[in-house]
Swiss-Prot record:
GO molecular function, one term: cyclin-dependent protein serine/threonine kinase activity
Annotated keywords: ATP-binding, Cell projection, Cilium biogenesis/degradation, Cytoplasm, Cytoskeleton, Kinase, Nucleotide-binding, Phosphoprotein, Serine/threonine-protein kinase, Transferase
Family: Belongs to the protein kinase superfamily. CMGC Ser/Thr protein kinase family. CDC2/CDKX subfamily.
GO CC, one annotated term: nucleus
Gene: CDK10
Cited InterPro entries: CDK, Kinase-like_dom_sf, Prot_kinase_dom, Protein_kinase_ATP_BS, Ser/Thr_kinase_AS, STKc_CDK10
CDD domains reported in the protein's UniProt record: STKc_CDK10 (cd07845)
Compartments reported by the entry: Cytoplasm, Cytoskeleton, Cilium basal body
Function: Cyclin-dependent kinase that phosphorylates the transcription factor ETS2 (in vitro) and positively controls its proteasomal degradation (in cells). Involved in the regulation of actin cytoskeleton organization through the phosphorylation of actin dynamics regulators such as PKN2. Is a negative regulator of ciliogenesis through phosphorylation of PKN2 and promotion of RhoA signaling.
Protein name: Cyclin-dependent kinase 10
Region described as Disordered: spans on this chain: 332-361
C-alpha cells in the first residue's frame, strides 16, 4: 500500500475570487494547540495583539504568547500580523525578540505567536524603579539596542515603532527589541510608505512633515529619543499633537532650513506648519553634564536631514561608548525581582481569553 494522500489545505484568495490549494511541499507542518500552554498572566498589549506570560506544559519553559488581534478581519489573518510573523521567522539575533513558533486556538481565526519571554520592559521599569539607571547602565542598554538595529538594517528591515515600551530586558540584562507589527522590509530604490507610523514622541521630523520615503534613519531618530529619555529619566519630546511635537523639536534643535536640510520645504506637510524662529540648538543646555562625545552622538542622531543622520554602525563606533563611565556588562545590570510580571490571574489553559488588566510590575 502506498502512503496516504496528504490532507488538502485550501486558502481563500483575497485579490481574486475563489480558493487555491497549498502544495504539500510548501507546508511547514501542523501547528501546536494553544491548549498546550498554561496561562500565567496578561502582561501587555502590542501594536496588533494581547501578550500573555505562559508555561509550555511539554517543556516547562516560560514564554510570552502574543494573541493575534482579528477585530476587523473577515478574510483571515491581518496583513500586519503576517508581516510580523514573516519578518520574525527570519530574524535571529540576541537583541531581537525570538519568535519560537505559531500556535492555534479552537477557531481558525485564533492564532498565537510563541515568543521568548523577557522579565520586564523598560517603560515599566522607568516608571517604577526607585533609582534611575546610571550612565554606565544606559550605555549598556543603548549599545544592545544599536546592535539589534544594525542587524535589522543590514537585513533591510525598518522597525518603525521604536520606543522604551518596545524594549524588553531579561533578568540577565539582555535587551531585546520587540513588537514588529509596524516593521517593513525595504528595497532599493525605497518605495513609498505611510508616514503615520512611530509613536508620536519618537517620530522623526520628516514623518511629521509627511514624507513617504522612509529609511532606517527614522529608527535612528527614535534611538536618540530613547537615549535622551534614559539619561534624563523622562521623555525628551512628549508632544500632545503633531503640531506640538514639531514645535518641541524646533524648541530643542532650532528651526530647520534648506541649508541644513535640503528639500525640507518641499515635504508634503511643510507648508501647513508655521515654525517659530528659533536659531539655537539647546541639547547642551538640556544635558549640561553630558560629555562632548555624548553630545556629539546625540546631535548626530538628531540631524534634521535623514541622509546625514547617524547609522547604527556609526553609533556603535562612537567614542561615547569608549569613555568613562564605560558601559557595564549586561550580566551586571541590576535585577528587579519586585517589578517582574508575576502570576496575576488564575492559572488556566489558553483556550479562552482572560479579561484581566495588564499586570503592572
Amino acid at each position: 500500500m502506498g502512503e496516504p494522500e496528504p490532507e488538502q489545505i485550501r486558502l481563500k484568495c483575497v485579490r481574486k475570487e475563489g480558493f487555491f490549494t497549498v502544495p504539500p511541499e510548501h507546508r511547514l507542518g501542523r501547528c501546536r494547540s494553544v491548549k498546550e500552554f498554561e496561562k500565567l498572566n496578561r502582561i501587555g498589549e502590542g501594536t496588533y495583539g494581547i501578550v500573555y506570560r505562559a508555561r509550555d506544559t511539554h517543556t516547562d519553559e516560560i514564554v510570552a504568547l502574543k494573541k493575534v488581534r482579528m477585530d476587523k478581519e473577515k478574510d483571515g489573518v491581518p496583513i500586519s500580523s503576517l508581516r510580523e510573523i514573516t519578518l520574525l521567522l527570519r530574524l535571529r539575533h540576541p537583541n531581537i525578540v525570538e519568535l519560537k513558533e505559531v500556535v492555534v486556538g479552537n477557531h481558525l481565526e485564533s492564532i498565537f505567536l510563541v515568543m521568548g519571554y523577557c522579565e520586564q520592559d523598560l517603560a515599566s521599569l522607568l516608571e517604577n524603579m526607585p533609582t534611575p539607571f546610571s550612565e554606565a547602565q544606559v550605555k549598556c542598554i543603548v549599545l544592545q539596542v544599536l546592535r539589534g538595529l544594525q542587524y535589522l538594517h543590514r537585513n533591510f528591515i525598518i522597525h518603525r515603532d521604536l520606543k522604551v515600551s518596545n524594549l524588553l530586558m531579561t533578568d540577565k540584562g539582555c535587551v531585546k527589541t520587540a513588537d514588529f507589527g509596524l516593521a517593513r522590509a525595504y528595497g532599493i530604490p525605497v518605495k513609498p510608505m505611510t508616514p503615520k507610523v512611530v509613536t508620536l514622541w519618537y517620530r522623526a521630523p520628516e514623518l511629521l512633515l509627511g514624507t513617504t520615503t522612509q529609511t532606517t534613519s527614522i529608527d535612528m531618530w527614535a534611538v536618540g529619543c530613547i537615549l535622551a529619555e534614559l539619561l534624563a529619566h523622562k521623555p525628551l519630546l512628549p508632544g500632545t499633537s503633531e503640531i506640538h511635537q514639531v514645535d518641541l523639536i524646533v524648541q530643542l534643535l532650532g528651526t530647520p532650513s534648506e541649508n541644513i536640510w535640503p528639500g525640507f520645504s518641499q515635504l508634503p506637510l511643510a507648508s501647513q506648519y508655521s515654525l517659530r524662529k528659533q536659531p539655537y540648538n539647546n541639547l547642551k543646555h538640556k544635558f549640561p553634564w553630558l560629555s562632548e562625545a555624548g553630545l556629539r552622538l546625540m546631535n548626530l542622531l538628531f540631524m534634521y536631514d535623514p541622509k546625514k543622520r547617524a547609522t547604527a554602525g556609526d553609533c556603535l563606533e562612537s567614542s561615547y561608548f569608549k569613555e568613562k563611565p564605560l558601559p557595564c556588562e549586561p550580566e551586571l545590570m541590576p535585577t528587579f525581582p519586585h517589578h517582574r510580571n508575576k502570576r496575576a490571574t488564575p492559572a488556566t489553559s489558553l483556550g479562552t481569553e482572560s479579561q484581566s488588566r495588564r499586570g503592572r510590575p
